[in-house]
Amino acid sequence: PLPFGQRIDRDAPVTAQFDGRDLPAFDGDTVASAIVASGQWVVSRSFKYHRPRGPLTFAGHDVNTMVQTPDAPNRLADELPVRDFPITTAQNVSGTLMADRNAIIDWFGRFLPVGFYYKAFFRPLGIWSFWERLIRWAAGLGVANLSITPRYTDKQYLFSDVVVIGGGPAGMSAALAAAEGGARVLLVDEQPCLGGSLTYHRFAIDTTERDQLAHELMAAVQAHKHIRVLSNALCNGWYTDHYLPVIQGNRLFKVRAKSCIVATGTSEQHVVFRNNDVPGVILCSALDRLIYHYGVAPAGGLVVLAGNDQAWLSALTADDAGMAVAAIVDLRRAPDETALSEEAARRGITVHCSATVYTADRDPKTQSLRAVSVRAVTEQGQVGDVIATLDCRVMAMSAGYMPAYQLACQAGAQ
């Protein structure tokens, strides 16, 4: 029930297929959310060693979700609506996704370092031409459909006083401030609806203030006559004299503005440990999106690895959604907010402070997470003995945030 599953319509079921397997889903689901909802975490295989890969961000910020559609390869499954892409397949596999014959390459990984093929296969003289053909055959991910008819595309010119990139709380506030000053504002957001982090991020134990702020800002933006909103739109450049190409569907908007405001938010950072690429290991923000946007609460137990208080809040969200939270493992001695540890204790959630996940264990049958090994942090950069081995199917982690500054950097900002 709401507030979980904001983007799906449970009265509009959709039948999709991934790799020949039926996926029950709802209108509003993405291919990735439907796959995870079906109980499977593996979506793709890594390029070189063919290790199993699963979603990490559920925001289109990682390549783990690349799949093949009938018309194009390398499409991000966490950005593909199942309504528009009912048939998708895995790519870069020999055999099936779950039984990839090329996964044997991973067994010899220690003998295949980065760039080894630039230093080998050159003797005896003339042998390189033979190896080059094999390497080129093995390269690549998906398959290009050369018989596909190119889709219709068009362009439109837009002029605005102020363009705001990003429809989160900062972007909506900036758009409202500019519009109240009399400016014509164009608000561009890559998500299907406004709100940004307000639609999934938990800022406090009590979510009332967040929900109220989200409702007020979105209502004010939609009602303002001087603000035009482009949702599901990507601004992929910022050029001289505030020329901004914005792509929405099959249309390219060539936007000119007097000024531009970038409010693109942040990207969550992962934690480094052994086997942190195992499917089922995700970011805390990805878990929040999965629950709030698509109403998916994966079964099998959850471990949260915390480097900040936000991870604790994600654990509370998962508990609210009915997930079995096995433990919170905090790299610090304690959370900054004592109310969080008190709330976790009240809910009966096990907590390991001054500890870290040292390694993740992969289930050979499901090719996804089975358990994590927890060790005590003894000093800076040092760990002690194993203090717990926790069975889980999902591990969410958060180690801080980095500004999504790519657009500003492309424009020359430093």
Task: State the predicted function of each range.
Residues P1-Q414:
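Residues forming the flavin
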